[in-house]
């Protein structure tokens, strides 16, 4: 089980054009800050429901708005309830509030920090803006430099939209240049209707927002970056999507929930203790309990698991079904013969067709006990052939 905690709910100090939390303000009427009793109950139950290694993820909105004193209490309660278990903390942030005091705290308590950044300035500032409409690039870069000066481990999260999707190498080389060793690319899709479950909808009952990334462009973007990575950066740069497929091909299963067979065990706890089945499905019908009233260990993603397992006939017949599993239920909005398939289907096929030969080559390397970074030599040979 993994639970993402949202101590400040949907609240944020930025107003990014594409943020799906902008619609949440009218939905939530509960207290927007996690109080002490809810925090304590969550930490106690989550540690009890976890194995010997417990991974906490703090997200938003913008979690740093909860304040440093809140996170000092996080450490206090974790230490109280950890017993012999080892605790890990990850913080996903826009970086705006990361001053010296924050960075010293994050270093002292060994937080892994995820920084949201969408590429070089002209690409990042296209959608990631302040409440006053100004670009945020300079402040984010300053935060990254401050993290580096305090030797805080960080990674990057990049939202692929209709603009930066056309600049894969510029984005990739930029992220490398700022010192990102671990990268995650999120494909952006938002509709005019809150994206819940389109399986029962008729065609054309929704519109795709302009900033969403076109499927084939996304596939080409990721394929271009994959080829750069597989020829030059394996073992040095870690890209979440690619690492997930390496894990899958080596027989260990996907590490990315999008392509897993089930949606179970990726829950969200809201600031008032409400538990939802997924970060992308924080809607009333997907609420499964409250940490202050129910036992966390008894909760699971029943509805999403059912949606995930409703694999359309088109997917069942696809050669990539074993490694794709129909993609994320959030993305299943494209009608095919009265069924809904992933909006990103054609893009995924472009990426899979690029990756699979190299993944198979990695499997052969592993069988022969050859370090996987040797795929870079193999990849160059394959390209020359």
From Swiss-Prot:
Residues 1-231 form the Radical SAM core domain. [4Fe-4S] cluster 3 binds at residues 315, 318, 324, 345. The active site is at 279 (proton acceptor). It holds the Pfam family SPASM. [4Fe-4S] cluster 2 binds at residues 257, 263, 278, 328. Keywords: 4Fe-4S, Iron, Iron-sulfur, Metal-binding, S-adenosyl-L-methionine. SUPFAM superfamilies: Radical SAM enzymes. InterPro entries: 4Fe4S-binding_SPASM_dom, Aldolase_TIM, Anaerob_Ser_sulfatase-maturase, rSAM, SPASM_anSME, Sulphatase_maturase_rSAM. Its cofactor is [4Fe-4S] cluster. It comes from the Bacteria. [4Fe-4S] cluster 1 binds at residues 12, 16, 19. One of its GO terms (molecular function) is oxidoreductase activity. Coiled coil: none annotated. Gene3D superfamilies: Aldolase class I. GO terms for biological process: DNA damage response; protein maturation. S-adenosyl-L-methionine binds at residues 18, 61, 116, 128, 189. Binds 3 [4Fe-4S] clusters. The first cluster is coordinated with 3 cysteines and an exchangeable S-adenosyl-L-methionine. Belongs to the radical SAM superfamily. Anaerobic sulfatase-maturating enzyme family. PANTHER family: ANAEROBIC SULFATASE-MATURATING ENZYME HOMOLOG ASLB-RELATED (PTHR43273:SF3). This is Anaerobic sulfatase-maturating enzyme homolog YdeM. It comes from Escherichia coli (strain K12). The lineage of its organism: Bacteria, Pseudomonadati, Pseudomonadota, Gammaproteobacteria, Enterobacterales.
